[in-house]
């Protein structure tokens, strides 16, 4: 158990924000900043000397993450209640059964923890050394107790940090096959992030209604073939492009898993911008074009460069699209309106009129509670291309 010794007094604005369900507090809202701990700790937040919340503080961040607005112990029962409630929401409200994002950080009042369930395999991203040291065993025990999980694979630290991952349960089981509608996918929990992008689940299923047999479909930044497989099982010929040879190998395995003939798919390893430029020069066209790039910015300071990259990518995609154009952004710092404006300006430049069919976001197992705009990151717009 972590002893909570430090009390930090917050200003009125932060207090009102917490009362309106925000789960983040900026250090600039702390009145007694000189009392901020020198290491990662759980702290008590007060307003006019009265208890407001318990929060996780990391000196490497300008944000404190709210753990609870109740004056309760952070212990086994604390984690059990939240993990159980998260499971009930996915299974009883959303009707997800075997595969889903079980824990979505602040969306489930469990900051720094991301956990995906793929049948009997679980994959966790853990971004707090304190939570790992003090509570990881409890969290893992609870996840096993509440499910049919056989293996939990824990990815620790941030990108670039050389920290060995942890494995609980069956240490030789890393791969499973999940179902998504009529599609099947191999998932390896040792892959990028937690192994598969569950946030796009509903958007991949939605894509199917726009696919006609014999369509040519271009899937840019296809990763392990999520959109490609859904297009292919509806009779399309698919071309997928990605920089990662490892991801493309899994994409090909996923296509084969769904019994798609070899003459109906092609995967190209390469830079999306360069590949699309060559396709335009060769006067290629596709009935459906999907753009699903990685985040072009991780910080607010780099938004202008990110928007330029989105503008270029969308311009190229629109030039290649004949009927349906699907474009996505997973950059937290590029909001919905900003992204839409960028796509529209790219359409003007390409001299193509687009009609917006739908503006979608992340799957509902990535919950966005009111007062927490930071939890909303995925944008996915479906357009009809007028000819």
UniProtKB/Swiss-Prot annotation:
The lineage of its organism: Archaea, Methanobacteriati, Methanobacteriota, Methanomada group, Methanococci. Pfam families: Methyltrans_SAM (PF10672), PUA (PF01472). Residues 5-81 form the PUA domain. GO terms for molecular function: methyltransferase activity; RNA binding. GO terms for biological process: methylation; rRNA processing. Coiled coil: none annotated. Transmembrane segments: none annotated. This is Putative ribosomal RNA large subunit methyltransferase MJ1649. One of its GO terms (cellular component) is cytoplasm. Its EC number is 2.1.1.-. Belongs to the methyltransferase superfamily. RlmI family. Keywords: Cytoplasm, Methyltransferase, RNA-binding, rRNA processing, S-adenosyl-L-methionine, Transferase. It is found in: Cytoplasm. The keyword Protease does not apply. Its main location: cytoplasm.
């Amino acid at each position: 158990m972590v002893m909570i010794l430090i009390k930090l007094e917050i200003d009125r604005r932060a207090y009102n924000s917490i009362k309106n369900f925000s789960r983040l507090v900026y250090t600039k809202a702390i009145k007694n900043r000189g009392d901020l701990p020198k290491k990662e700790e759980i702290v008590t937040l007060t307003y006019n000397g009265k208890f407001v919340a318990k929060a996780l503080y990391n000196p490497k961040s300008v944000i404190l993450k709210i753990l609870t607005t109740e004056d309760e112990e952070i212990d086994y029962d604390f984690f059990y209640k939240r993990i159980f409630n998260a499971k009930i929401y996915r299974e009883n409200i959303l009707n997800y059964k075997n595969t889903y994002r079980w824990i979505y950080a602040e969306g489930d009042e469990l900051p720094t923890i991301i956990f995906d369930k793929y049948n009997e395999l679980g994959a966790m991203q853990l971004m707090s050394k304190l939570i790992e040291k003090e509570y990881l065993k409890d969290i893992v025990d609870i996840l096993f107790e509440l499910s049919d999980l056989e293996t939990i694979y824990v990815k620790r630290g941030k990108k670039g940090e050389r920290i060995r991952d942890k494995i609980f349960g069956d240490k030789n089981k890393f791969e499973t096959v999940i179902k998504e509608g009529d599609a099947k996918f191999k998932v390896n929990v040792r892959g990028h992030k937690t192994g598969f992008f569950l946030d796009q689940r509903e958007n991949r299923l939605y894509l199917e209604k726009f696919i006609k047999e014999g369509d040519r479909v271009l899937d840019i930044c296809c990763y392990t073939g999520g959109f490609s497989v859904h297009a292919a099982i509806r009779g399309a010929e698919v071309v997928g492009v990605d920089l990662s040879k490892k991801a493309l190998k899994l994409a090909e395995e996923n296509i084969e898993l769904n019994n798609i003939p070899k003459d109906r798919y092609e995967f190209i390893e390469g830079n999306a911008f360069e590949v699309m430029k060559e396709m335009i020069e060769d006067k290629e066209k596709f009935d459906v074009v999907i753009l699903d790039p990685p985040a072009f910015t991780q910080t607010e300071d780099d938004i202008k460069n990110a928007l330029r990259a989105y503008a270029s990518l969308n311009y190229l995609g629109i030039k290649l699209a004949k009927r349906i154009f699907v474009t996505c952004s997973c950059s937290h710092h590029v909001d919905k309106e900003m992204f839409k404006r960028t796509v529209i300006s790219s359409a003007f430049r390409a001299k193509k009129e687009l009609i917006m069919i739908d503006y979608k976001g992340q799957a509902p197992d990535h919950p966005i509670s009111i007062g927490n705009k930071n939890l909303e990151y995925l944008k996915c717009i479906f357009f009809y291309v007028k000819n």
